[in-house]
Amino acid sequence: FAGTLGLCVLAIAIIAVKQRKTGVPVRLPLLLLGLIIFQAALGMWTVTLNLLPVVVMGHLLGGFSVLSCLFILYLRLRNTAYKLPKNNDTPSASEMHDNAIGDLPQAKVFQRNLRRFAFIGLGVLVTQIALGGWTSANYAALACTEMPVCESGWQERIDIAGAFSVPDADNYEFGAHDYGERVTMHIVHRFGAVVTFLYLLALGICVLVSRHATDKQKYVGAFMLVALCTQVALGLSNIIFMLPLAVAVMHNAVAAVLLLSLLNLIFTVFLSLENDQA
């Protein structure tokens, strides 16, 4: 699968370079190609460095980065296709309304603020994904099996410095950190989940209730909230049911869906501001 993906991205990059004069994005496909090459190296290092946690987490983040770049490329190409004239027809009223933000200064201010807060949300979400990757790479997903925080006495086990360091070991399979450090990783990931949930929940609700948000943004905001609630349910299920494989895989998959929905929201903001300036 990895080889097929690499060949597809290589083909995309070659086509983009050849079609660069037609307005097709070039830098993004080239960035994708570089990410694929780096991903291949991380995959090799995962084996040769005996599951070094930094490499395992980097491999996960690299996969999310490749998926994000592919999605952004899709959005840009779709938007370019929509801009192409079709039999000299003018856009319909519904098409113009979908991305219009109006002439009111408040609408423009809302879009600029939404762009800022959506980027902050992206940073929060990526940080939480990285924390999840670090927790998983160090086999700390089951370090805490009680709610809402951890087993009693967890306060005495907190070791931030140790939890986010890489101990010397010949092999990192099944983890090389002690129990207290794994508890710390798990708890930080839980608190990160709370922060991420509250922030994205507030962001999504603001989009839904604002009269300055476009129809597309409201749709994306609603989808993001559904993905967010699903992700929380999957995270709780991982703890309650002791990390079943299917739930763990879905937890990663929905994290990717949540990331893509947030990227889509950001794209709609740029599209609205761009249409307003045109």
Residue ranges and their predicted role:
Residues F1-P91, E95-A278:
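Polytopic transmembrane helical bundles with strong interfacial aromatic enrichment
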